[in-house]
Amino acid sequence: MNYEESRAYIRAAELKKGIVLGLDNMRELMRRLGDPQDELKYVHVAGTNGKGSVIAYLYSALSGAGYRVGRYISPAVYSYRERMEVNGEPVSREKFAAYVTRIAEVIDDIVKEGKPHPSVFEIETAAAFLYFQDEKCDIVLMEVGMGGDLDATNIIRTTVLSILVSISMDHTAFLGNTLSEIAEKKAGIIKPDSHMVTVKQQPEAEAVIRRICEEQNVPYEVADRDDAEVLEASMTGQTFLYKGEKYTISLAGAYQKENAVAALRALEILNEQGYPTTQEQRQDGLKRTTWPGRFALLGTKPDFVVDGAHNPAAADMLAASVERYFKGRRIIYIMGMFRDKDYRKVIRKTEKYADTILTIAAPDNPRALSPGELADAVREFHSDVRPYDDIESAVAEAYHLAGTEGVIIAFGSLAFLGDLTEIIKKHNGGNND
């Protein structure tokens, strides 16, 4: 297969198999591929919101310290191949095609034996393991796809460190209807006799994580956002004090302090586990971290911000950031949501800041609410809402409504943020300022 054929193969697999939780298929697939995952060292990250940001901080700091660092994330924002990278370089088209070709041959044998066809995420995760093995990574930063205990990434037997970011209600159809049930699934990545760190969790989630740590003989370590004091914050970044040292980050979201503190606590633990970094490397790593679609300022006059808030907890964080930076300004929203998310709660938590809300849909995505459906839901809470069938028209209208002094905030599913970002860049004459 060439690259285009490998992508077509994956799209076809999506039609055969949707979301699958359980490790039997993955174990069978990886066994036939030679279990490349067993040759690597991992930092495994689970939770509802903040996984990508914490991984971005660690990736920057560890790469800057000279380690060969693999990173596996989903979804990608700009390029599909961003899902698997080593030291800032995405997997090449040729290598990705070769991995998928090899995996497809193994899957043919599996299916001929009457066993289930692996899911898209299982195929992608298998390709990532093959890639990181080939690249001889010193350490791999692995983001859970959904949940934790039964996620395809949890095929790994040991971890250098498990990290739990903020846990809240999401994917309830798969993970459970209470915070305790969801925390149980996500804390399933904690391996016996290993190390873990969690951000400060809600009491129900904390109780579950403490119990699992005790059962697995793992010290319960908390990265507490209250240990950091914000000294200054603007849309271009934040400076905070943590354990007597100053750190600057370029990510503006009010919630980024928590993610940065989680990364710093993780780096302290990794220091003791054979991955030392200096104070300067940690400071430089955090300062250099970029992460698209996380309360990111992509243009000025008007200010144009994009954010991946797609569930109620993320909506709370978005609201806090809007309150911090844009209170009293004229605000236009561009919103796109998936139908399997609690979009009504997202609307309810954010609508009061908007003068006008424009609704769009992620292109060619069956999970996306149509602009009309989303507009109908918004009208339950907000009177000035306008649906747009294409993203470019919505952006043009947002610029018209905002003028030069207003604020445009595009948020919701990351699936449309890549397209949106390209449109904004074009509007700005090809650069981001």
Question: Language-model segments: which ranges?
Answer:
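ATP-dependent carboxylate-amine ligase catalytic core
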Residues: 28-30, 35-38, 64-157
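Active-site-proximal loop/hinge segments that shape catalytic or ion-binding/gating pockets
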Residues: 413
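Acidic, Mg2+-coordinating active-site environments of NTP-dependent enzymes
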Residues: 111, 135-139, 143, 159-246, ...
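Beta-strand->loop->alpha-helix junctions that form or flank phosphate-binding loops
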Residues: 73, 199-200, 212-234, 250-254, ...
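Nucleotide phosphate-binding/pyrophosphate-handling subdomain across enzymes
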Residues: 39, 139-142, 150-163, 167-171, ...
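Short, high-confidence coil segments that cap the C-terminus of an alpha-helix
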Residues: 135-138, 328, 403-405
